[in-house]
């Protein structure tokens, strides 16, 4: 088995692998969630030695109780078949062996994470979009987008289902917010591209991307339609029909 691949190569690696069986898929989801927590948020609490680039020794990781029953082969399969390319594997030196990291999404500080600075308007993708949900929309209109405890705000270079879009937005998001990247860049807001193609920004000094950088918004579900950035349409919370009209008015306030 070849452990030299990483998240950036998984699309090619997965084509030559059989599709996981249903029970195997359940285990893979469990493993993926455990990896996400350990590599993005919990490394220090779990006592994992994380390098400045976000990599940790896979052998040390697999010794943790939550990873008992999983093998290096299981991890390789999850890395290879993860559609959003969340993880990367690489060979370390003989003393550490195989290393693994999350490509983005950290709440931990990872000073040497492999991020490409996007320093000019020409370097930015033509589209920068953040996916969110109705329950967050009133606050976003008022305060802007927030890092929410992570080191970056996540943006996608397209909408779910667009060609070549693998990560950056959950597929079940209800609202898409389109960002004026050149305007934010001109105001000193930095942007980066992660190893799996997600566009990241820390926002301003308070960790926010303010509403003045919103170009437009689009309702994604149940049908696509433009939304007012003034917040003057009825917030129907379409995916949550249990909300009463009184509750919807309260959400709008």
Swiss-Prot record:
The protein's UniProt keywords, in alphabetical order, are: Acetylation, NAD, Phosphoprotein, Transferase, tRNA processing
Q: What class of enzyme is it?
A: transferase
Q: Which InterPro entries match?
A: Ptrans_KptA/Tpt1, RNA_2'-PTrans_C, RNA_2'-PTrans_N
GO molecular function term, any single one: tRNA 2'-phosphotransferase activity
Q: In which tissues is it expressed?
A: Widely expressed. Weakly or not expressed in lung, spleen, small intestine and peripheral blood leukocytes.
Q: Where is the composition biased (Basic residues)?
A: 243-253
Could you tell me which residues belong to the region Disordered?
Answer: 1-29, 225-253
List Phosphoserine occurrences by residue. 240
A GO BP entry is:
tRNA splicing, via endonucleolytic cleavage and ligation
Known catalytic reactions:
2'-phospho-[ligated tRNA] + NAD(+) = mature tRNA + ADP-alpha-D-ribose 1'',2''-cyclic phosphate + nicotinamide
Q: Which residues carry this modification: N-acetylmethionine?
A: 1
Under Gene3D superfamilies, the record lists: 3.20.170.30, RNA 2'-phosphotransferase, Tpt1/KptA family, N-terminal domain
**Protein EC:** 2.7.1.160
Q: What does this protein do?
A: Catalyzes the last step of tRNA splicing, the transfer of the splice junction 2'-phosphate from ligated tRNA to NAD to produce ADP-ribose 1''-2'' cyclic phosphate.
Q: What family does the database annotate?
A: Belongs to the KptA/TPT1 family.
Write the protein's name: tRNA 2'-phosphotransferase 1
Give the gene symbol. TRPT1
């Amino acid at each position: 088995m070849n452990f030299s691949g990483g998240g950036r190569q998984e699309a090619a690696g997965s084509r030559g692998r059989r599709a996981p069986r249903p029970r195997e898929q359940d285990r893979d989801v469990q493993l993926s969630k455990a990896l996400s927590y350990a590599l993005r948020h919990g490394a220090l609490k779990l006592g994992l030695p994380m390098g400045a680039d976000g990599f940790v020794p896979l052998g040390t990781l697999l010794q943790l109780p939550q990873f008992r029953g999983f093998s290096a082969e299981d991890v390789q399969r999850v890395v290879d078949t993860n559609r959003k390319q969340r993880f990367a594997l690489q060979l370390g030196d003989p003393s550490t062996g195989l290393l693994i990291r999350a490509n983005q999404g950290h709440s931990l500080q990872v000073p040497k994470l492999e991020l490409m600075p996007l320093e000019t308007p020409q370097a930015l993708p033509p589209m920068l979009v953040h996916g969110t949900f109705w329950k967050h929309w009133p606050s976003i209109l008022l305060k802007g987008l927030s890092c929410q405890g992570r080191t970056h705000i996540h943006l996608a270079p397209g909408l779910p289902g667009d060609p070549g879009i693998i990560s950056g937005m959950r597929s079940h998001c209800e609202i898409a917010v389109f960002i004026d990247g050149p305007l934010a860049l001109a105001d000193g807001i930095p942007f980066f591209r992660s190893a799996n193609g997600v566009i990241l920004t820390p926002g301003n000094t308070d960790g926010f991307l303010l509403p003045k950088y919103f170009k437009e918004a689009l309702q994604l579900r149940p049908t696509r339609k433009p939304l007012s950035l003034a917040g003057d349409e009825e917030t129907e919370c379409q995916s949550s029909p249990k909300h009463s009209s009184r509750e919807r008015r309260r959400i709008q306030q």
